[in-house]
Each structure stands twice: as C-alpha cells, then as structure tokens.
C-alpha cells in the first residue's frame, strides 16, 4: 500500500528543486506529532493539468544533482516556527518535513523527514531504520543511478572527442565531431595532423551552388594556395573532394586559429591601442605584399577584420579565408564578391587588381582605429554602393584621432585606384617602420643617377656595437645593383663594427633604406618622362643618337628586386650568323643571343633608358647611318629587327612616340610588351601580308592575312582567342593592323606598274622572303604594351648600322649595334648602295669606316637639312672593276662614288661601284640603286661572307650596253686591251686616283664628275680611291671594303689602307671587321685538301656585274616612305622613271649572270680546282629564296646546312655562327659565312 505514496514522493522530489533552493526545511505539524497515514498530496505547480508530470531521466538527473548540491545546507538547517497548518481535513497542502526528533516513530509509519534525509545524504549509517523502510528505499536508489549514468555519459563524451569521425584520403588528417565555427558556406571542425600531432582546422565548404567551371577554378586556387608559407598567412595544408550527406563538398585542412579574429578582439576590448594597431597593420601589409608578389599575383578580394586571425601565443595576426571569394560569388546568388563595406568601387564592375586589397586594408584600419564598422550609418548595400562610388567616406573616418593613421586610411580608400597607396608605399611609411634601434640614412644627397650611395648607419644604443663608437654613425658606400645588404652587414660584423647579434637588424635596415631610395628614383624618373612627353604625339624627325663605342659608364641594376624578371633581353653583338638569321633573328634570339648581366661592356650606359637596350640586335650590318636631329629627339633602338622599315615606306617608328620609352624599373604588375612587325608583302596571286608578332609572354607568332579577304577585327579576335595578345592590347593591335593595311595598299597601288615587270621574271617557286623590321611602339593612350613595325623590305636586308652621335668618335661597321647605341623614333631610310670611300666634303657628312680592330668606333656627323632638291651624287666614272691577281694579292683601290642625300628622310650613305669606269659608260638607273640598296645584304641571309657587296649605284636614265668579259691580267702586271681593267695599287697606303701607265694601269676617266640630276637626287663623285673589292665567285656575297672619309678618322683610315690589300692576316682582319656592305666582288677564301690555301695568281679577276635585284622580291625595295613621297611634288615623275629604267635593265640580268658564272669557272680553272657542281652566279643566287625553318631547336650547324641555298664548293670553309672565326674573339663573331682566302696556311 505504500508503494504508491513512495512513487508520488519521488515525483514530488523531482519537482522540489526550486523549492528546496529557496525555502528552509518545513517545521512539524501543529501538535508536534508526526502525521499518520499517507501524506497529503502536494499542490502541483501547474494545477490546471489533471495528469501527473511524466517521468524524465533528464529531469531526474538534474534534480539529483541539485539535491546533491543542496545537501550541504539542508540537513543542519534548524527548525523555525511557522504559522500553524490548516487542519488535515483541509485540502491538500504542501508537504512539510518534520524536524529531527529523538522519538522514533513506529515501524511501518511514514515520516516526512525520512525521504528528505534519504535524498540529501543516502550514505549516513546512523539513519534510523524507519528511514530506510520499504517506502524509503526507492528514493535512495535515485542518486546512485544518476551518478553512474553521469559518469557513463562523461566517458562517452570523452570517447567521442578522442575518436575520429572522418579521415583524409591519405589518412594523415583526422576529423573530430567538435564544431568550432560555422559560416555562410562552411563549417569548421577540430582536426589533428597525425604526422606532427598538431591540431588543425577541418573546413567543409559547400560547393553545391557552384557551376562546374567555378568548382574547377576554386580547386585550382586551392592548389595554388597550398605552397604559400608566410608568418602572416594562414597556412593551407591539404584539400580534397568529399561527399557529405549525399552532396559533394570540398574539405580544406588549414592552420587552427583558436584566439579569434580581429572582429572578436574589437568586440571584447572596443578600443585598440596605437602600438597594437601599428604592429598588426604592419603584419597584414606584409602578408598582402607576399600574396601580391607571387607570379601571378594572388588577390584576396575579401579582406576584412573577420578574416584576420589572431595567434594567441605570439600575439601576431594572420590573413585567412584565402581563395573563398569564388565560393562567396555563388553563395550570395547574384551579388558580387566580397563584403560591401570593404569593397573598392572597381569591384562592382569586376575589373580589379591588387588595389582592391589596398582599399580593403584601409577599411580594416578604419575599423581597428574606431572600433566601428565602416558605413554603419547605411541601412543596406545600395546605400553603401552609392557612397563608395560617389567618393564619400564613411562617417567613422572623421572619428580617427591619430593624424598619421587618418592619412594612411585616406590614401588607401581613394576612389581612383591609381591614386591609392601601393603596398610598397605603405610599408615604407614612417608609421609602419619598426623601431629596432638601427637607422640607416643618406650621407649625401641623391641625384638619382649615381650607382654608389654613401650611407650612415646609426645605432641608438652605443653598447650594442663591437667597438665603442660614442653612438657615432658608421659611413659606408653601397653600390646599387652590386652590393647586397646581407653582405654589407656581414662585413661590419667581421670588422667588429657591429655585434653578431645585430646582424639581422642591420641587414634589414640597410635593405629597407636601399629599397626606399630605389622607389624614389623610380617615381622621379616616371615624373620626368611624363613631363618630357609632348602634348600631342606626332612623327618627330628621324634621329640616330650616337653613343661611344665601348661604354664607359656601367648602368645601374634594376631598382626593384622584382625587376630582375622584367629585365629586357639584351643581345650579344655580332652573335648572329646571316645564314641562320632566318631562324634565329626571326625569333629575336639565338643560342648565343642573350646578354649576360655581368657583361658591363654590353650594357647600356646609365643615361640611356634601358628600354632602348631591350631590343638591341647586333647583326652584320651594311651601313652606318646618321639621320639629322632637329631638336632633342627621343631615344629609340631598332632593337628587335635588324632592317629599316623606312625602305618600304611604312615607317612608323616615330608615330605617337614620346621622348623615350619606359625604363626597365617597372611596376610589379607590368607585363612584357608585344611587338608587331611586317616581314613581307606579296601580290603575286593574292595580296598577302606576312607579319610577325612577339607576344606578351615572349613567344613568336608568324601569321599572314589577305588584304582583300581578312578584316582587322577577325585578325584581332583570332589573336585574342589564341591568347597571342591580351584583351587590353586588342585596340592597339587593331590600329596597327589598319595602319599596315592602309600603307600597304598605298604602296601596292603606286607600284602596280613596276611590279608587273618583276612578277614576269619571278620563278613560280619564288616567294617574297620575309624581312625583319624595326619594332615600333604603339601610340596607345591606354598604356598598351603592343608595338608594331610595318616594314616591307626584303628579307635580304640584314641590318643597317646605327652609329653613335658623339662627335669625333669613328664608327666601326664591325660593331654596328653596340648596346649603348639607341635609335630615336622617326622614319629611318637606309639607302644601301655599294661601298665607297668618299673624301671629306660638305656633301658627305657621314661615312662608313673599315678598321682592322672590330671594336666599336661610332661616327658622329650630323646630317644637315636642305630645302633644295635632295642630292644623290653617284658617278660611276671613277669606279673601275676590281680584280684578284694570282700571285701576291695587291691592293686595288677603285675610285669611289659618293651618295649624299640632303633630304631629311634619306641619310647619305657612302657607296662604291664595281662597274667599269669609262666616261662614256652610262650610269645605272636610280631604280637599280634602290633595288640594289635593298638587296645589298641578301647574301648574308643565304650564305654570307665578310666583306662588302659591291653593287651599282643609281645612274641616269640611259641605255646600258652589254658588258663584255674582261680579259685576264698577266701576273707581271701586263694588261690585255680591255675597257674594263682593275686599278692596281701597292699594299701600302693607296694614293689618290691618278692616271697610270697603260701597261700597268688604266688612266682614270675623270678626276671628278660633274653633278648629275637623277630623278630628285644629285649624283656626284669623290676623288679618293676606294679599297679593292676582291671577287668571291662561289660565295653568294662578294666582299669589298669601304674606307673612312671623315677628317677625324685619319689614323683608322691609314690603318685600313695598310691592311687592306696585304697579307692574309690583314685581309682577315678587314673581312672580320668590315660589315658595312657586301658586294658582288670579293676575295674567296678556299682551303686545299692539305690544309693549305693556294694563292691566286696571274690574271686579274673577271668583271663582276650588278644583280637584277628587282627580280628577287616583291615590293621590298621601295626605299621611300609614303609620308615623304606624298610630301614631294615629283613623285609621279620619279616612279615613272623607275619603271622605265627597270625595264631597260632587265635585259642585262641574263648577261650579268652568264658573265659571273663564267668568271667563277675561270677562277677555278686558274686555281687548278675542279669547279663544284651547280655553280650559280651571285646575281642568280640573290634570286633564290631562303628556306624558312620552323622555330625548332636545331643546332646552329644544322640550321646553317638547312638554310644554304647552294652547297659550297670544295675547300670552302664555313665559320660557326657561335665562334665567329678561328680566333673565337667576341669582336669577330659577326664574320661567319663562306669565304675564300688567298693565304696558304691560315684557317
């Protein structure tokens, strides 16, 4: 019968947790006697419910715990008298426990105190038996069961925390079911790295809203982030795909950050101390600088205080949540990336760069300085967007108290991203500078040019040094680009000036000061460039600034450490073989084409912008040109291409150019510039233009397009699609293509007549050979990096030499492109004609010099502008044929004709003629002059020989009779009757041309011819004889040698004359150093089987004849620019004359080829050699097109063999394109090709 009351008592006990905590123990009844029978039912708290409260184990546990806590004070509580209870007949009242009494109730009766005691302390042995009766044992079991259950749950919880619920695919990382964070699209659990026993963060990212492409992009970003290790970047350990609750997710294992974020810190402390703000802001900047300096740069795009984590033990901060902006894009449906309060204005347009992280950093600093969320006054993102785009700052900006912090924040959150601070600027700011007790200062004023700087090292604590210095500064010299801060600090430690413990602070202080100086110099240089730019870009006059041959000033190294990767390519001088030029120079480089940074002689001088040297291509050049400068012209290098695009009439070198291009010290985000150039034009079947593009990633792309069938938009779209040009370069590319098309069509229309004759003589297999051209920067106001050159010259143009402009310094054709020789923008028109040696006269302001020393000797001679008709004096009357004797080779010095162009677009070029000189001999047409000018260096591309190509200069329009083969000259000097005889002179310094006895020499026709007008040019002749032009029958090029004519070149001139015709050593030096032009008559170097070379003896060389070069190319010999031609009033007459004169000389082509072939056979017969099979006359070889090789990795020798149009005869030795000559000297690298020598023992 007592079971029911016991059950009810247990329920009452479970409901008394609050009552027992608030009330003292109840007193006894009114009479002081214990009540008999079942106790009255206690009124329930929720009396409205009829049914009792259901049993709950959880409720029972809580009651037992609370009762156990209350047992300490409920038992000793003394009874207090209470008001008397109502009678028993009354309704049920609250149960009250009687006080402890000495009177024991009878067995079987119920006491109110027993259950309470049992509940409070069930382990008391002194409890009376009535307390543990049948009705009170059930309550005693409740606390025991609860304690056991609690212990069991505790163990289960511990097991759950120590037992992994998931593992990584490789088993290294474990996941525990302990959630430590949750975001909008990620959940973070605690994990463990079993290899290092370090706790990690296990992040599960939801990617169900991402598309397939976005998911792939995110995976790539995560893979990229794995390799990042920086003390201020949260470390990424691993990532993989996993299936969670039936959905694919990405798991990231990152470094565990348990001390919260900057956001939680601000919520807790509300205000951040300035020193903490300084330290943490500097650490954030370092982390951002590390991300932005990667290649390619890594952008955070969602930087805010919630993503900056605090490392508790060290008190440093780390940037986290990298790469999650891709997920956030899809997580917020159509919204943009990032948090609106921290988003830069350009983020809304999704056209951004590293500047967006600078903007977000400024907002983070604003929140740290004010403990107020930016734009908290705005109600929604739309209001924030309006304030951000309108340039209004958040209201909290005006609450910043520290002026320096306010200045930094203002510089970071500017609307224009170009006006914001950069990460480097912020790190160099005085507010973020660390106080390490070490200061480095400038000991002298920096002029921005000196490579060496005097610096002072000051240390605050005088006792820190190894020697007592009384806190005096240590002065030392630091060479920019050569010294390293660590090396300087190590030297100080070794000398005892600095303690070893101060090595790191000193090195860091020096490094930071040097970096600040370099940044300052860079800003000043950019400011000077902007000031020097003209208001409206226009075609400036063509200028060729001259620089001294051997540069004496070493240029400073790139200013930024990161600038090394932007260092422009410099090319070694004379490292290109003309036989391999089709492959090598088209790709702008060869196996020996890179300039070592340690080669000071080949580095541009400090005053010359390095961008001018980035495209210096050193090639066997034909001429040294000096084009007049009307003012302080801009410096420009002909760099990437080795031919002038002026000859095609498409020169746009100077269009849109400023005074100089950007120097190599660039921003980290600068990309390499692209270059576009025209290599050939043909209208044989279709009007096709072939161009070559150097892409932004230094790849060479050759493409052709039809003038009639392809539109510029289609070409640009294809280039962008194939990633040959950047989207930002598309507009500039379109402008260049349109300009190319317009100019090509203009030239094609003008030359339809003359070219019809050329097409008739072309063989079906011949195609116009591509011709390298000058790179031309695009006048793009948007700072595009695309450059183009629209040259249409023939491929046979190897180069024209650019000489430096320092007066008095001679030019050496052997080193035509010294790296310090910039070329200013402007139309450059190389008028290539046979080499000559004009005497000093006002009509020859420039001359090419031949020196046995191939070191650079640039000439400086300004070209005067002339308002009169351009002069083109080239008389042939004093140019006798050169011949090669069989015995010791004497020096032949034919008189030379001089070409002087007074037109500003035509630099005067010295030229000689290998035509027979007679008073009645008609001059060649001006058409052939232009044609031969373009074809002068044709053999250097086919199979070059050092020397000068002797070709006919322009002649007045008169019929040219067939030239008979001259009879050989006897060894004794006797000369058979012939109108064409070489003028023989001694090996010593040749005297001026004068009449000689008929037995030995022919009397000169005339000392000096009267000027003759040919078209728009005046042709005159010079008195001074030229160097001999020995014949080179089997070589595609026949070399001669020009002689210097400027007054300041007397010593070099005499040296050349002494060495011109003498022994093999002098002739080898002459051949090695003379690259100014190449002729049809040259000495042929032939080696016998026994290693000795037979000397040529006996009769003089047969006549060499000019080549009909107009048969060999299409529209590549047009030497007049469209701008110059359009400005002249005599264009129509000039072009009509060209057409007629070309027709007249077509008949001579076959005669010349026949004569030359016979001359080669006669030479072999005189030498006692068997003529090689397939002899082709040099004039005929010019017409054979060179094979174009793919940009494969052929060895140089293999390329030489692949590109030879004709196999060389027996005994011909080919020089390696890398070694240059047997001496292997660097100065002689330009001399490679096929040559014959008259010496016996020399290789």
Swiss-Prot record:
| Stretch forming the signal peptide | none
- List, separated by semicolons, the cofactors it needs: Mg(2+)
> In this chain, where does the modification Phosphoserine occur?
97, 331, 335, 575, 1035, 1217
Q: Which disease is given in the protein's UniProt record?
A: Pseudohypoaldosteronism 2B: An autosomal dominant disorder characterized by hypertension, hyperkalemia, hyperchloremia, mild hyperchloremic metabolic acidosis, and correction of physiologic abnormalities by thiazide diuretics.
**Subunit (UniProt):** Interacts with the C-terminal region of KCNJ1.
Q: What's said on domains?
A: The RFXV motif mediates recognition with downstream kinases OXSR1/OSR1 and STK39/SPAK.
User: What is the protein's name according to its record?
Assistant: Serine/threonine-protein kinase WNK4
């Amino acid at each position: 019968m007592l079971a029911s009351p016991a059950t009810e008592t247990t329920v009452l006990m479970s409901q008394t947790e609050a009552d027992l905590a608030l009330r003292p123990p109840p007193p006894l009844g009114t009479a002081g006697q214990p009540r008999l029978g079942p106790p009255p039912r206690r009124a329930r708290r929720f009396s409205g419910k009829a049914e009792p409260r259901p049993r709950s184990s959880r409720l029972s546990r809580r009651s037992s715990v609370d009762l156990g806590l209350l047992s300490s004070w409920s038992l000793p509580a003394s009874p207090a008298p209470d008001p008397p209870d109502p009678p028993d007949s009354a309704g049920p009242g609250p149960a009250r426990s009687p006080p402890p009494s000495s009177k024991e109730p009878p067995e079987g009766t119920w006491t109110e105190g027993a259950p309470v005691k049992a509940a409070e302390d069930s382990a008391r042995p002194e409890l009376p038996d009535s307390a543990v009766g049948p009705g009170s044992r059930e309550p005693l079991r409740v606390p025991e069961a609860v304690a056991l259950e609690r212990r069991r749950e505790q163990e289960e919880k511990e097991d759950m925390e120590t037992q992994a619920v998931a593992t990584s695919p490789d088993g290294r990382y474990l996941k525990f079911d302990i959630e430590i964070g949750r975001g909008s699209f990620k959940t973070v659990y605690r994990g463990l790295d079993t290899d290092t026993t370090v706790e990690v963060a296990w992040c599960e990212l939801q990617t169900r809203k991402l598309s397939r492409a976005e998911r792939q992009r995110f995976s790539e970003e995560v893979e990229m982030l794995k390799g990042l290790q920086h003390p201020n970047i949260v470390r990424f350990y691993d990532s993989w795909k996993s299936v969670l609750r039936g959905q694919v997710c990405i798991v990231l294992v990152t470094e565990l950050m348990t001390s919260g974020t900057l956001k939680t810190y601000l919520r807790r402390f509300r205000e951040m101390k300035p020193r903490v703000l300084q330290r943490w802001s500097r650490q954030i900047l370092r982390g951002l600088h590390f991300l932005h300096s990667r290649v390619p740069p890594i952008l955070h795009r969602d930087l805010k205080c919630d993503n900056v984590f605090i490392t508790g033990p060290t008190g440093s901060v780390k940037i986290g949540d990298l790469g999650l902006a891709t997920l956030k894009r899809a997580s917020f449906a159509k919204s943009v990336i990032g948090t609106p309060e921290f988003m830069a204005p350009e983020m809304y347009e999704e056209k951004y760069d590293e500047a967006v992280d600078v903007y977000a950093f400024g907002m983070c600093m604003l929140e740290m300085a004010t403990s107020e969320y930016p734009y908290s006054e705005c109600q929604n993102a739309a209001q924030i967007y309006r304030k951000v785009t309108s340039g209004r700052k958040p209201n909290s900006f005006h609450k910043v108290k520290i002026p320096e912090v306010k200045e930094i924040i203002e510089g970071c959150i500017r609307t224009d991203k170009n006006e914001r601070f950069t990460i480097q600027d912020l790190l160099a700011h005085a507010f973020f500078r660390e106080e390490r007790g070490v200061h480095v200062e400038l000991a002298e004023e920096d002029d921005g040019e000196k490579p060496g700087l005097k610096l002072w090292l000051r240390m605050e604590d005088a006792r820190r040094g190894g020697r007592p210095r009384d806190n005096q500064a240590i002065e030392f010299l630091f060479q920019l680009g050569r010294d390293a801060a660590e090396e300087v600090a190590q030297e100080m430690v070794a000398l005892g000036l600095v303690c070893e413990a101060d090595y790191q602070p000193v090195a860091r202080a020096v490094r930071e000061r040097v970096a600040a100086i370099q940044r300052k110099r860079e800003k000043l240089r950019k400011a000077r460039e902007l000031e020097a730019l003209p208001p409206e870009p226009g075609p400036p006059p063509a200028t060729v600034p001259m620089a001294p041959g051997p540069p004496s000033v070493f240029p400073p190294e790139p200013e930024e450490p990161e600038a090394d990767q932007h260092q422009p390519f410099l090319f070694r001088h004379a490292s290109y073989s003309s036989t391999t030029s089709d492959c090598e120079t088209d790709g702008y480089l060869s196996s020996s084409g890179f300039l070592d940074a340690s080669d000071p002689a080949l580095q541009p001088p400090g005053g010359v912008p390095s961008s001018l040297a980035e495209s210096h291509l050193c090639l066997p050049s034909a001429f040294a040109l000096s084009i007049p400068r009307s003012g302080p012209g801009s410096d420009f290098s002909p760099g990437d291409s080795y031919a002038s695009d002026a000859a095609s009439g498409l020169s746009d070198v100077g269009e849109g150019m400023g005074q100089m291009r950007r120097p190599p010290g660039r921003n980290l985000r600068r990309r390499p510039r692209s270059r576009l150039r025209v290599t050939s034009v043909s209208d044989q079947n279709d009007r096709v233009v072939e161009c070559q593009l150097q892409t932004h990633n230094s790849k060479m792309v050759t493409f052709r397009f039809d003038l009639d069938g392809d539109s510029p938009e289609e070409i640009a779209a294809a280039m962008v699609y194939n990633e040959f040009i950047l989207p930002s370069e598309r507009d500039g590319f379109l402008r260049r293509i349109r300009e190319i098309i317009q100019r090509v069509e203009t030239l094609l229309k003008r030359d339809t007549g003359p070219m019809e004759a050329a097409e008739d003589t072309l063989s079906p297999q011949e195609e116009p050979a591509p011709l390298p051209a000058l790179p031309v920067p695009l006048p793009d106001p948007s700072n595009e990096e695309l450059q183009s050159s629209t040259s249409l010259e023939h491929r046979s143009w190897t180069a024209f030499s650019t000489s430096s402009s320092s007066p008095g310094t001679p030019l050496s054709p052997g080193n035509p492109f010294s790296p310090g020789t910039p070329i200013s923008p402007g139309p450059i028109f190389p008028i290539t004609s046979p080499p000559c040696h004009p005497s000093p006269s006002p009509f020859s302001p420039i001359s090419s010099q031949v020196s046995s020393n191939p070191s650079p000797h640039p000439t400086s001679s300004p070209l005067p502008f002339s308002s009169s008709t351009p002069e083109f004096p080239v008389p042939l009357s004093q140019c006798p044929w050169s011949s090669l004797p069989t015995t010791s080779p004497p020096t032949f010095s034919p008189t030379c004709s001089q070409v002087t162009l007074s037109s500003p677009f035509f630099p005067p070029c010295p030229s000689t003629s290998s035509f027979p000189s007679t008073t009645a001999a008609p001059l060649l047409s001006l058409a052939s002059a232009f044609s031969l000018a373009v074809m002068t260096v044709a053999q250097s591309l086919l199979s070059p020989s050092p020397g000068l190509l002797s070709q006919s200069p322009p002649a007045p329009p008169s019929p040219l009779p067939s030239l008979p083969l001259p009879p050989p000259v006897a060894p004794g000097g006797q000369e058979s009757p012939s109108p064409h005889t070489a003028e023989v002179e001694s090996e010593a310094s040749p005297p001026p041309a004068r009449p000689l006895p008929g037995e030995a020499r022919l009397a000169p026709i005339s000392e000096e011819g009267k000027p003759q007008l040919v078209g728009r040019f005046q042709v005159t002749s010079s008195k001074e004889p030229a160097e001999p032009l020995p014949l080179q029958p089997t070589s595609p090029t026949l070399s001669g040698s020009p002689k210097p004519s400027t007054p300041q070149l007397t010593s070099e001139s005499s040296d050349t004359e002494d060495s011109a015709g003498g022994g093999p050593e002098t002739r080898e030096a002459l051949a090695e150093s003379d690259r100014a032009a190449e002729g049809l008559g040259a000495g042929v170097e032939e080696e016998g089987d026994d290693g000795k070379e037979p000397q040529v003896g006996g009769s003089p060389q047969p006549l060499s004849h000019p080549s009909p070069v107009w048969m060999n190319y299409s529209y590549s010999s047009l030497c007049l620019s469209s701008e110059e031609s359009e400005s002249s009033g005599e264009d129509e007459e000039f072009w009509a004359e060209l057409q007629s004169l070309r027709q007249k000389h077509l008949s001579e082509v076959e005669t010349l080829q026949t004569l030359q072939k016979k001359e080669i056979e006669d030479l072999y017969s005189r030498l006692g050699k068997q003529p090689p099979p397939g002899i082709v006359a040099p004039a005929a070889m010019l017409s054979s097109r060179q094979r174009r090789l793919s940009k494969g990795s052929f060895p140089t020798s293999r390329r030489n063999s692949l590109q030879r149009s004709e196999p060389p005869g027996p005994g011909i030795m080919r020089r390696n394109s890398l070694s240059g000559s047997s001496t292997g000297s660097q100065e002689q690298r330009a001399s490679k090709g096929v040559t014959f020598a008259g010496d016996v023992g020399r290789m």
